Curated annotation (Swiss-Prot):
It catalyses: ATP + (deoxyribonucleotide)n-3'-hydroxyl + 5'-phospho-(deoxyribonucleotide)m = (deoxyribonucleotide)n+m + AMP + diphosphate. The active site is at K246 (n6-amp-lysine intermediate). ATP binds at E244, R251, R266, E296, F342, R419, K425. This is DNA ligase 1. It comes from Methanosarcina mazei (strain ATCC BAA-159 / DSM 3647 / Goe1 / Go1 / JCM 11833 / OCM 88). Belongs to the ATP-dependent DNA ligase family.
Amino acid sequence: MRFKELAELFEELEKTTSHREIVRKISEFFKNLRGDEVKDSAYLFLGSTGPAFENTTLGIKDMLAIRAIAGAYGVTREDVRKRYARTGDLGDVAFELSKKRESSLTIEDVFQRLLQIRETSGKGSQEEKTALFSDILQKATPEEGKYIVRLVLGRLRLGFGDQFLLEAFAIAFTGDKKHAAKIKESYSVCTDIGELAKILAENGARATGFISIKPGRPVKSMLSQRVESFEELEKRVKGKKAAEEKYDGERVQVHKTGEGIKAFSRRLEDITSQYPEIIEDVRKTVPANEIVLDGEIVAYAELERNGNRIEEFYPFQNLMQRRRKYEIENYRKKCPVAVFFFDILYLNGEPLLKRPYPERRALLEMNVVESGIIRLSKRIVTESVEEIEDFFNETIEKGLEGIVVKSMSSNSYYEAGKRSWFWFKWKQEYSEGMRETFDLVVVGSYYGRGRRKGSFGALLCAVLNKEGQRFETLTKVGTGFTEADAEEINRLLSDHIVSEIPKGVSIKKGMLPDIFIEPAVVIEVLGSEITNSPGHTAGEGEEETGLALRFPRFLRIRHDKTPYDAMTVKEVRDLKDGT
């Protein structure tokens, strides 16, 4: 298929606001694709060249893109810069400059060229990337050029995520949207959307019956529900239950296939290179040939005090020093870590997601030998809520976040990608009267004054309305930031500034920020009360006013979460209603 048809669809989708209409248009497009076009297009719709667990960055920033655009269209870089300053979008600049009326570019041509740019590395790679980019722009029509530039820069900005695509797959490949729920479940296990699209195109609805976990391809993490009190725990989890320490670190999945070992973050990113000591110790202490483990990496050290060995857990912020590509050995010494495994998902050819938690825990203990770095989560098994409360208090004294209480029932399966009713978390903030922390998406910022001049004064934050797959504002956050926090947030937001309310974001007129931010950055916030508010759009309906979070205070950036992992409108409303 010609790339022109995909570019024209992108243009249509950018202007379409109806959820149903977006899904319909995408499904019609996929019905007409053949062979590798299905897989390639699935990636392109998400502005990528592969799944999240591959390094899909093309390595081209604005400066190189300006050079490529100038070279492609025979204009000066200064001309491109001026047009960019006016439009705020290098894709629009390419659209303005391109004079080509006809193009023979196919989807495969464009996808392969993007792969070529991505895989070019080493000495002279910047010049080669620029030449490859410039060359394909010369062959493209204005519409094609606009979206090629956006794809190269990773700024497609269609205003929707993977859930729209999965609903479209249901219609295109099974003929009925009712299969969307099963397809979404399958996507939690097969997190490669291109591979999933290919399997569905070839097998239809029956494909969801044989998609399974595969070592080397991370699954979406199972998450915990929230409870209001220890008494509620007793109602939610009958009989015997396990209480495990909850660590304030980075969620990790470790996949071992023979000598090959990889670590993946909650966002499914490959973080293997950041934690070489964990990879080394897994190789020594985990004898299984094929295994997938779920755990938490924490900044941690064992120290000796007064002749006693004690565990020292350091704040999550310390761990962020390890999120780097360079000076790994230096920061390995500065910030020692341990990984606490609490689940096993696959073992020597056998998927374990449908095995109950007690069986999985037994297999975990049989297949992981603890070392200084490789640990198993500490836990108690009891029917007594009083014992669980005592265990919780012990974890807080150790400097931990709290506990996770897990069902021991015969159907306590690992529910990938779900906030499961088999796991419940209880954190220190809850016992202090702060019922919840909120993972919110930044959608705007307000200019700072005084010591914050030149930075933001407050951030406009939103929650996810899952039904409409849009972001609705909940609060403005202006306290809790250190100078280092503000600097890091400014850096993260700078790539996502747009000139108008981003598509898929709902903001009231009286709440309009000075700067609009497309949904990309997630922050964790502590708040004291949820109230009704006509000023915010979270949960607003024909008969319901919006919701607002009062007295929010910034806690940290959630590098491990995507906007679609943020708190939902339903979760906020449930907290307000006490359900």
